[in-house]
Amino acid sequence: MLPASPKMEHKAVVFLLLLFLKSGLGDLLDDYVNTQGASLLSLSRKNLAGRSVEDCAAKCEEETDFVCRAFQYHSKEQQCVVMAENSKNTPVFRMRDVILYEKRIYLLECKTGNGQTYRGTTAETKSGVTCQKWSATSPHVPKFSPEKFPLAGLEENYCRNPDNDENGPWCYTTDPDKRYDYCDIPECEDKCMHCSGENYEGKIAKTMSGRDCQAWDSQSPHAHGYIPSKFPNKNLKMNYCRNPDGEPRPWCFTTDPQKRWEFCDIPRCTTPPPSSGPKYQCLKGTGKNYGGTVAVTESGHTCQRWSEQTPHKHNRTPENFPCKNLEENYCRNPNGEKAPWCYTTNSEVRWEYCTIPSCESSPLSTERMDVPVPPEQTPVPQDCYHGNGQSYRGTSSTTITGRKCQSWSSMTPHRHLKTPENYPNAGLTMNYCRNPDADKSPWCYTTDPRVRWEFCNLKKCSETPEQVPAAPQAPGVENPPEADCMIGTGKSYRGKKATTVAGVPCQEWAAQEPHQHSIFTPETNPQSGLERNYCRNPDGDVNGPWCYTMNPRKPFDYCDVPQCESSFDCGKPKVEPKKCSGRIVGGCVSKPHSWPWQVSLRRSSRHFCGGTLISPKWVLTAAHCLDNILALSFYKVILGAHNEKVREQSVQEIPVSRLFREPSQADIALLKLSRPAIITKEVIPACLPPPNYMVAARTECYITGWGETQGTFGEGLLKEAHLPVIENKVCNRNEYLDGRVKPTELCAGHLIGGTDSCQGDSGGPLVCFEKDKYILQGVTSWGLGCARPNKPGVYVRVSPYVPWIEETMRRN
């Protein structure tokens, strides 16, 4: 029997204060999770006028007809939609020009403190009994009801704590013999951590030794690759302790120049951790939830027990990772690898992947057996799209703002219905840009939780003659008013296109029919060229020029304005690279001239190192390539080559006139050419990064070269390989490069091995795609062998040396 409590007798009740209400509107928005391009199909909603996001947030807080859990803001229509539902219980759809704001408190399935503010959807007690609805009177007549306590969140039969009970959320039960019972709600990770603290969101900002944490958005005193904007789902706020890389517990970079990083002392939560989902005896996805008993690697090695340190020492122990199911010596995937793996009992082989039967072919799996799986379609190289891009089957997987596309078969971070099963003829392969619903151009869901979808960074195939400026334009110079093409997002477009992509005439900017508006008028935006009904981009929309339409049911739409063809811009190849995902040992042969900045350094006509064209007269390479240099007359630079063993028509051969080594002995050097290279579609410079720019960890980059292939394939042909950047903190672990990597160097590679630069690739480029161009971020420098497991390649960071590079070129 439970003791007597306020739940059984009348007692004065402390009225609940909604803790998420703040005094300032700016603070109020901190209590919302926002997602661009997302819309809810809510049944309880109101459409209201709203001039700003803050205005809409205030209207949501003031709503009295229902509990407002979310709102949508439509900037071009100046409209708020306040709603009773959120994404937990209502389908989410993609929509243009909308940002969905959801109250964080209604998305959480955990409690803070005693759970007085808990608004989750758990509806059963600790003992597994279903909760009675708060509005019901059977089997128990409640003392706490929605009518008496309208601010207590007494919805449906969800667990709540309307009387501030110190034991946490509870509910009346559907068992006639048990009036009420407590619910098993996990603690939110703001004061404590579950598992290894991957989801810790607290504000502890000191390390175990008492050092202050360095802010995540700072690069001083320690430069690093955990840039908050590149890790939107890791909550890298302020200088709070976090765990973005799968360590045993949260940590931070420190403000002590002598101590790069250190663990933080975060207490463990006393409640059970949230469920990680069902365990499978077969391989589903990457095997994150594999719970089978396979204990042999793919090459036949027996697995080492996770709790043991011989023959291989490691920190991936059951004690450090209590929620990763590291039992016995069974294959597991505790760190997000491509498949389950284990340390081996062979002292010469540290770890290997395991061969696990797939759930798709396993009799143990009955999930979705009735759904036909479309055949895998082979993507074809395509540099542009025709029409609205429904037929596009290329391999581009980057959005117009540079975000990476989410796989069409994945539901993380965005759940959706545009799957290969639902759209079998739409070519929804991998995470490639597609147009399954006949939008204006190819698009994709993004891997950024804050941005549901975006159009892709693809140009439309055009029959229009190229418009090449007579001379390069200075930064900031706009395209001529008469040009009916746009540069960038078209904010400076002043052409006369006046119909939408669907062919609907545009409404005049000064008119208020059929659509009323007040923000984008000639009076409010006198510098935006809002003349007549011409397509314009007054708000800098990343999707380009738009207009209000003459269709009363369609407030606005985008216009089909082509990009102006410019002269050869740095980092923009005229041939779309293959970007093979293969693992230049083990890479793939590149498409000819798709990496037009690649240079072959020749000594007596023989290739010995790579290099990168960074301007018509300058090449960047590795200093160690020039250690035993003879007279400069022996050296030539070869540009525009694909097959280094054949003299191709596109090749330019230029002697080297001067050599400049970096003065602090970094492995980087500049070569001045005796004459400028002729910029063609086969010869284009790569872009330099901003000074001291840090490449984010896990950024996908590419290396190219003619180096040693160790008998793989493609001898003599330029090869490419895709490599993720590895944070120096990880790369310098004992099992990898053991502290050898300097702050002015970066690591990139697949830790399993199989892909790497090798002899002859030294000095060549490591380029990373940023928004719409390739940036030279690294110069191939050194490695411990070629493509060895656990030994990624090391590259000189280019950004710290940009001031020296620019000054050297300016003076010479």
Swiss-Prot record:
Q: What class of enzyme is it?
A: hydrolase
Which GO BP terms apply? blood coagulation; fibrinolysis; proteolysis; response to heat; tissue remodeling
Q: Where in the cell is it found?
A: Secreted
Can you state which reaction this protein catalyses?
Preferential cleavage: Lys-|-Xaa > Arg-|-Xaa, higher selectivity than trypsin. Converts fibrin into soluble products
Q: What is its EC number?
A: 3.4.21.7
* Superkingdom classification of source: Eukaryota
Q: Which Pfam families does the record associate with it?
A: Kringle (PF00051), PAN_1 (PF00024), Trypsin (PF00089)
The Peptidase S1 domain covers 584-810
Q: Which residues form the signal peptide?
A: 1-26
Gene Ontology MF: a single term: endopeptidase activity
Which catalytic residues are annotated?
624, 667, 762
Listed GO cellular component terms?
A: extracellular space
Q: What's the chief localization of this chain?
A: secreted
Q: List the disulfide bonds.
A: 56-80, 60-68, 110-188, 131-171, 159-183, 192-269, 195-323, 213-252, 241-264, 282-359, 303-342, 331-354, 384-461, 405-444, 433-456, 485-564, 506-547, 535-559, 570-687, 580-588, 609-625, 701-768, 731-747, 758-786
Annotated positions of the Phosphoserine modification: 600
Activity regulation field: Converted into plasmin by plasminogen activators, both plasminogen and its activator being bound to fibrin. Cannot be activated with streptokinase.
Which residues, renumbered to this chain, are glycosylated?
A: 315, 365
Q: Which UniProt keywords apply?
A: Blood coagulation, Cleavage on pair of basic residues, Disulfide bond, Fibrinolysis, Glycoprotein, Hemostasis, Hydrolase, Kringle, Phosphoprotein, Protease, Repeat, Secreted, Serine protease, Signal, Tissue remodeling, Zymogen
Q: Where is the Kringle domain?
A: 110-188, 192-269, 282-359, 384-461, 485-564
The record, for SMART domains, names: KR, PAN_AP, Tryp_SPc
Describe PTMs of this protein.
N-linked glycan contains N-acetyllactosamine and sialic acid. O-linked glycans consist of Gal-GalNAc disaccharide which is modified with up to 2 sialic acid residues (microheterogeneity). In the presence of the inhibitor, the activation involves only cleavage after Arg-583, yielding two chains held together by two disulfide bonds. In the absence of the inhibitor, the activation involves additionally the removal of the activation peptide.
Entry's family note: Belongs to the peptidase S1 family. Plasminogen subfamily.
Q: What does this protein do?
A: Plasmin dissolves the fibrin of blood clots and acts as a proteolytic factor in a variety of other processes including embryonic development, tissue remodeling, tumor invasion, and inflammation. In ovulation, weakens the walls of the Graafian follicle. It activates the urokinase-type plasminogen activator, collagenases and several complement zymogens, such as C1, C4 and C5. Cleavage of fibronectin and laminin leads to cell detachment and apoptosis. Also cleaves fibrin, thrombospondin and von Willebrand factor. Its role in tissue remodeling and tumor invasion may be modulated by CSPG4.
Task: Describe the subunit structure.
Answer: Interacts with CSPG4 and AMOT. Interacts (via the Kringle domains) with HRG; the interaction tethers PLG to the cell surface and enhances its activation. Interacts (via Kringle 4 domain) with ADA; the interaction stimulates PLG activation when in complex with DPP4. Angiostatin: Interacts with ATP5F1A; the interaction inhibits most of the angiogenic effects of angiostatin.
This protein's domain notes: Kringle domains mediate interaction with CSPG4.
Q: Under what name is this protein listed?
A: Plasminogen
Give the organism, scientific name.
Bos taurus
The taxonomic lineage of its organism, from the top, reads:
Eukaryota, Metazoa, Chordata, Craniata, Vertebrata
**Gene that encodes the chain:** PLG
